[in-house]
């Protein structure tokens, strides 16, 4: 018997980090919630990262996902912007890891290919396909739609690949070790 798995997708960004929550039961997907966590651009970097940490922690506490998927960082020509994105991505990886949740990572072109059938799809195409796959989804910002696309990608690929166990707390240690072991056991069935 297949059980519902609550999957949180995260689209990291320093200004806006999108999040999207779905349930997957086999190949059936259902929309639960989505939104963005923002940081104040006038604050120093450390305080902006704290805002993202607190916001994502609230999302995890409120929505209790079973698994988390995060978009990988792409390198662009602006090194400073890439570094800032890397900081936000680190928070997006750290928060679920501290909660004892398994985390998977997906490249942007794989997300686009999975959701729209084209690894170079435009944002408008991604949003249209997210709406098609999750008809009840309501998102006002592209960041939330992207996060839902990341969650959809994880739902599509989670049975075919094992989660990257490097993000798991060492067996038997840490407050989330039991929850990670249970989540990984569900994946191995």
UniProtKB/Swiss-Prot annotation:
It catalyses: Endonucleolytic cleavage at a junction such as a reciprocal single-stranded crossover between two homologous DNA duplexes (Holliday junction). Mg(2+) 2 binds at residue 71. One of its GO terms (biological process) is DNA recombination. Its main location: cytoplasm. Mg(2+) 1 binds at residues 11, 143. It is an enzyme of class 3 (hydrolase). Pfam families: RuvC. Gene3D superfamilies: Ribonuclease H-like superfamily/Ribonuclease H. The RuvA-RuvB-RuvC complex processes Holliday junction (HJ) DNA during genetic recombination and DNA repair. Endonuclease that resolves HJ intermediates. Cleaves cruciform DNA by making single-stranded nicks across the HJ at symmetrical positions within the homologous arms, yielding a 5'-phosphate and a 3'-hydroxyl group; requires a central core of homology in the junction. The consensus cleavage sequence is 5'-(A/T)TT(C/G)-3'. Cleavage occurs on the 3'-side of the TT dinucleotide at the point of strand exchange. Homodimer which binds Holliday junction (HJ) DNA. The HJ becomes 2-fold symmetrical on binding to RuvC with unstacked arms; it has a different conformation from HJ DNA in complex with RuvA. In the full resolvosome a probable DNA-RuvA(4)-RuvB(12)-RuvC(2) complex forms which resolves the HJ. Belongs to the RuvC family. This is Crossover junction endodeoxyribonuclease RuvC.
């Amino acid at each position: 018997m297949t059980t519902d798995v609550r999957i949180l997708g995260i689209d990291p960004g320093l200004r806006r980090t999108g999040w999207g929550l779905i349930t997957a039961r086999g190949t059936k997907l259902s929309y639960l919630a989505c939104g963005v966590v923002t940081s104040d651009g006038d604050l120093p970097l450390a305080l902006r990262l704290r805002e993202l940490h607190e916001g994502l922690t609230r999302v995890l506490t409120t929505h209790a996902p079973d698994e988390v998927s995060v978009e990988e960082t792409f390198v662009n020509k602006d090194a400073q912007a890439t570094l800032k994105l890397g900081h936000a991505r680190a928070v997006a990886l750290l928060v679920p890891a501290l909660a004892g949740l398994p985390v998977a990572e997906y490249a942007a072109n794989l997300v686009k290919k999975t959701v729209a059938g084209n690894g170079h799809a435009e944002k408008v195409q991604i949003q249209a396909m997210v709406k098609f796959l999750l008809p009840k989804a309501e998102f006002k910002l592209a960041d939330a739609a992207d996060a839902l696309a990341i969650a959809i990608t994880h739902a599509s690929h989670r049975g075919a690949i094992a989660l990257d166990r490097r993000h798991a707390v060492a067996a038997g240690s840490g407050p989330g070790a039991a929850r990670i072991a249970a989540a990984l056991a569900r994946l191995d069935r």
